A protein has these predicted regions:
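Alpha-helical interface subdomain recognition
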Residues: 1-3, 8, 16-21, 32, ...
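Flexible, small-/acidic-enriched active-site or ligand-binding loops
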Residues: 111-139
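Beta-sandwich/jelly-roll carbohydrate-recognition scaffolds of carbohydrate-active enzymes
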Residues: 52-56, 72
Length: 305
C-alpha cells in the first residue's frame, strides 16, 4: 500500500505544483526522507460525491489558510509526513459549477499534529491502515497551495486516475497469486485416488479466472500507456480498476473454493487475501459509479446520479 500511495499522491504535486514546491519537497519524497502517503479527499457525508465535501479552508489576514472539517478513510495518515488535502475555498452556493471552488493543499503533518490536526485509526477486517482525520483551525501556509485556488478538483482527478491504475495493478497481482495458489493446490490435493485438479469442476473456475485476469491486465497496460503519455485516460483507468477488481475477486473465490475447508485456515493465507481483495469492489471507487461514468461519458447516456 505504501508504494502505490507514494506514487499517486506524489503525482498531484509533480504535475500541478510550482517549481518552488517541487524543488522543496520532491527530492526528499523521492529519497524517502519524507513520506507522502495520505490523500485527504473522502468525507463522512460525501463519499464519492466529492464536490459536496464540507472541509473548508479560509484565508486569514496574512493570506494563509485556516482549515476546519473532517476526512474519513484517509489511509496511512498515521505513517505519513505529508498529506495532499482537498478542501473547499469558495462556498458551494457561490460558484457557477459545483466542481469550482475546491483547492488542493500540501499539509506538513509533522507540524500540524497537535496544532489542529487529529488522527484517529479505524479498525477494519483486513490488514489496511486507515483513519479519520479532524481539522480544527489548522493553519496551512499560502505557499502550500498547489496550483490555483479554486481549480483543485481538476488537479485531484489526475491523482485519482493514477490511483485507479495502481490499484488495478495490485488487483492483477492478487489475481495471479490466487490462481497460482489454487492451481498448485489442485495439482497436489488428492481425493478418491486422484488430484482434484483432474476434475473439470475444479479446473474451469481457475481457468476462467486466469482468462479474466489476463484481459484485465491488458486494460491496465492501456490505461498506463495513456496516463504516461498525458492523454485523457479517465475511462481506461476506471475500466482497468473495475475489470481487475472483478478478476481478483473471482480468482479469490475460485481459490478459496478449491481449498475447501483449508481455505478458511489462517496458515494457508487464502482467507486473509480473500478479505483484502474484497475491498476493491468498493474502493477507491465503486463498480456502480464506474458503470455510471462509462454510460454517461463514453456512451453519451443521460446522467444517472
Amino acid at each position: 500500500g505504501g508504494c502505490h500511495a507514494q506514487m499517486y499522491t506524489m503525482g498531484t504535486l509533480l504535475r500541478h505544483g510550482s517549481d518552488e514546491q517541487k524543488a522543496k519537497w520532491l527530492p526528499k519524497i523521492a529519497s524517502g526522507e519524507l513520506r507522502l502517503q495520505a490523500f485527504g479527499v473522502t468525507e463522512p457525508t460525501s463519499g464519492t460525491d466529492t464536490t459536496s465535501l464540507k472541509t473548508f479552508a479560509k484565508k486569514d489576514a496574512n493570506g494563509d489558510y485556516v482549515v476546519n472539517g473532517q476526512k474519513i478513510w484517509t489511509s496511512r495518515a498515521e505513517y505519513s509526513d505529508l498529506m495532499i488535502l482537498l478542501a473547499r475555498t469558495t462556498p458551494k452556493d457561490q460558484v457557477t459549477k459545483k466542481t469550482e471552488g475546491l483547492s488542493v493543499f500540501l499539509v506538513d503533518m509533522r507540524e500540524a499534529r497537535g496544532h489542529g490536526l487529529e488522527i484517529r485509526p479505524i479498525r477494519t477486517m483486513m490488514n489496511h491502515a486507515t483513519t479519520e482525520v479532524f481539522f480544527t483551525d489548522m493553519k496551512v501556509p499560502k505557499e502550500n497551495l498547489i496550483g490555483e485556488e479554486g481549480k483543485g478538483f481538476r488537479y485531484i482527478l489526475s491523482g485519482m486516475n493514477a490511483e485507479r491504475i495502481l490499484i488495478a495493478s495490485e488487483c492483477v497481482g492478487d489475481a495471479k497469486w490466487f490462481i497460482a495458489k489454487a492451481s498448485a493446490y489442485a495439482k497436489d490435493r488428492a481425493v478418491f485416488g486422484r488430484p482434484i485438479g483432474q476434475n473439470q469442476g475444479i479446473q474451469f473456475p481457475i481457468a476462467k479466472a486466469y482468462a479474466n485476469m489476463r484481459a484485465a491486465e491488458l486494460m491496465v497496460k492501456e490505461a498506463t500507456r495513456k496516463y504516461e503519455a498525458g492523454m485523457d485516460c479517465g475511462a481506461e483507468a476506471n475500466m482497468a480498476k473495475m475489470l481487475a477488481a472483478d478478476a481478483s475477486f473471482e480468482a479469490a473465490n475460485a481459490c478459496i473454493q478449491t481449498h475447501g475447508g483449508f481455505g478458511f485456515a489462517e496458515e494457508y493465507d487464502v482467507e486473509r487475501k480473500f478479505r483484502e481483495t474484497r475491498l476493491y469492489q468498493v474502493a477507491p471507487i465503486s463498480t456502480n459509479l464506474i458503470l455510471s461514468h462509462l454510460a454517461e461519458h463514453v456512451l453519451g447516456m443521460p446522467r444517472s446520479y
